[in-house]
Amino acid sequence: MDFVLTRLILLFLAATIIYSSEDESRLINDLFKSYNKVVRPVKAFKDKVVVTVGLQLIQLINVNEVNQIVTTNVRLKQQWEDVHLKWDPEDYGGIKKVRIPSSDIWRPDIVLYNNADGDFAIVQETKVLLDYTGKIIWLPPAIFKSYCEMIVTYFPFDLQNCSMKLGTWTYDGTLVVINPENDRPDLSNFMESGEWYMKDYRCWKHWVYYDCCPETPYLDITYHFLLQRLPLYFIVNVVIPCLLFSFLTGLVFYLPTDSGEKITLSVSVLLSLVVFLLVIVELIPSTSSAVPLIGKYMLFTMVFVIASIVITVIVINTHHRSPSTHIMPQWLKKIFIETIPRVMFFSTMKRPAQDQHKKKIFTEDIDISDISGKLGPTAVKYQSPILKNPDVKSAIEGAKYVAETMKSDQESTKASEEWKFVAMVLDHLLLAVFMIVCIIGTLAIFAGRLIELHMQG
């Protein structure tokens, strides 16, 4: 019994499907019996076809800053009424909607005007949804490659204003009128990008009058997208490493000159920076229209490192100076031995002796005026008989020579210590200066743009 009932139900469903298929087939044949897809679907020639256009943005595939091309995945929704494709559902088994190939009917030749790859038209031949009232809905998918003028001045904290200009290719405003479905594109199915944030998006309709036909308007719908770059990737992989290189450069001046590794460290930092720049150069837009912020910062870091090498050479040269080759001017002593240490609060550092008491070789009871042939400032009229002895005179002359030699060595050592002290003061001064310049330079390059973006919300 159940088997018989099942067979009856299946036969009934099969008959219904066959009957419905016959109704749909008959409907399609009747609709296209005398249909001409080249002619606009209007009753009179002066009538206009009103096309409603809506853009559904699915995905932002790629933003090519070098070639200034934005690749997007979209669905272009188009609605219009075809007066030749209407029917009464009662005559065709209650069928109210059918799906037919878009290539079999008239359709507006809407193209992307600012296309960047030459494929202006929509190439996907998808089906349209046809209502018994003649209303047609066509929602073809498309990959748009649109031209967008890239302003990379503030890269990687940049905003890009890109657009898609849509309009009919052959019909002017007296034949086909295009209206936007909404004042904004549809982003309900938009897949967020890992590099860009859709900050704002708008839609405008334009009436354009060309020189060839100043009385005939041509209509277009332009969708504008304000794209803000997400800079985290570039901050982590470019900005922070460059900042660390700058701080490492400053630490060169904290390394003692006697270690002999100051130049080695400076050159190592420079070579590391060059290798790093060669690796990340592909991440930066290669355009000559403007120097991006990150390019300025990389240039600043390079100059910073090279300047540290040059100054380090000067410091090392100062450290190894001697009185036989260089005599320290008094103004240099005044600045680097007296003034700067006191101003920079390292007066506790051991300074070279400024005033030393001269050692007296001879006592008041001894006069060597007879040796030099002149009376000394402390000479007395009485001379001991011992001084008349030639051996004593020779011993006194030897002692005088030794004293003068010791005095010369002490002055030479003192001068060398003064040069070393000046080099040490330079190191401490340059350490502070380089750290301050590193911080101020970084803020000067990036802070203004970051504050501007914060003010814009």
From Swiss-Prot:
InterPro entries, alphabetized: Neur_chan_lig-bd (IPR006202), Neur_chan_lig-bd_sf (IPR036734), Neur_channel (IPR006201), Neuro-gated_channel_TM_sf (IPR036719), Neuro_actylchol_rec (IPR038050), Neurotrans-gated_channel_TM (IPR006029), Neurotransmitter_ion_chnl_CS (IPR018000), Nicotinic_acetylcholine_rcpt (IPR002394)
Disulfide bond residue pairs: 148-162, 212-213
Topology class, membrane: Multi-pass membrane protein
Localization of this protein: Postsynaptic cell membrane; Cell membrane
Expressed in which tissues: Oocytes.
Residues that carry a glycan: 161
Reaction(s) the record says it catalyses: K(+)(in) = K(+)(out); Na(+)(in) = Na(+)(out)
GO molecular function: acetylcholine-gated monoatomic cation-selective channel activity; transmembrane signaling receptor activity
Main localization, broad class: membrane
Record topological domains on the Cytoplasmic side: 317-428
Entry keyword tRNA processing: no
Record-level GO BP terms: acetylcholine receptor signaling pathway; membrane depolarization; monoatomic ion transmembrane transport; neuromuscular synaptic transmission; response to nicotine; synaptic transmission, cholinergic
Pfam families: Neur_chan_LBD (PF02931), Neur_chan_memb (PF02932)
Alphabetic keyword roster: Cell membrane, Disulfide bond, Glycoprotein, Ion channel, Ion transport, Ligand-gated ion channel, Membrane, Postsynaptic cell membrane, Receptor, Signal, Synapse, Transmembrane, Transmembrane helix, Transport
Summary of the function given for this chain in its UniProt record: Upon acetylcholine binding, the AChR responds by an extensive change in conformation that affects all subunits and leads to opening of an ion-conducting channel across the plasma membrane.
Similarity remark: Belongs to the ligand-gated ion channel (TC 1.A.9) family. Acetylcholine receptor (TC 1.A.9.1) subfamily. Alpha-1/CHRNA1 sub-subfamily.
Cross-referenced NCBIfam families: LIC
Subunit and partners: One of the alpha chains that assemble within the acetylcholine receptor, a pentamer of two alpha chains, a beta, a delta, and a gamma or epsilon chains.
Protein name as it appears in the record: Acetylcholine receptor subunit alpha-1-A
Chain's gene name: chrna1-a
